[in-house]
């Protein structure tokens, strides 16, 4: 059976991995997942990520903890296959009054809400991370 929403699966694996205090989680890789992982790493929500395998690439995320607690408090899918959510540059949300981030897919690539606001871009809101 095919996976309907691979991004929601990625976010769920991160959420479950941190709830179980796992060091790392693995999942099938894609360009969008790698772009999201890159944003999460730049913002300090994960330690690192790497791609392994040639024929079927696997993405491995090293999860991050601070004083025994998970760094990612909440991670929530917003735009989904059945209901895409697009926002203009003026309508981009602030997650937890600026403490969290919104991961946004723009015409210039995947970036945070702050970077999109700075670049004057809108796009599809993939998820909220806090």
Curated annotation (Swiss-Prot):
Recorded coiled-coil stretches: none
Gene3D superfamilies documented for this protein: 3.30.1370.30, 3.30.1490.10
GO biological process: translation
Assigned GO CC terms: ribonucleoprotein complex; ribosome
PROSITE patterns assigned to the protein according to its UniProt record, in alphabetical order: RIBOSOMAL_S8
UniProt keyword terms in alphabetical order: Ribonucleoprotein, Ribosomal protein, RNA-binding, rRNA-binding
Domain of life: Bacteria
MF terms (GO), sorted A to Z: rRNA binding; structural constituent of ribosome
Alphabetized PANTHER family for the sequence: 40S RIBOSOMAL PROTEIN S15A (PTHR11758)
Function: One of the primary rRNA binding proteins, it binds directly to 16S rRNA central domain where it helps coordinate assembly of the platform of the 30S subunit.
Family assignment from sequence similarity: Belongs to the universal ribosomal protein uS8 family.
Quaternary data: Part of the 30S ribosomal subunit. Contacts proteins S5 and S12.
Protein name as catalogued: Small ribosomal subunit protein uS8
Organism: Yersinia pseudotuberculosis serotype I (strain IP32953)
Record lineage: Bacteria, Pseudomonadati, Pseudomonadota, Gammaproteobacteria, Enterobacterales
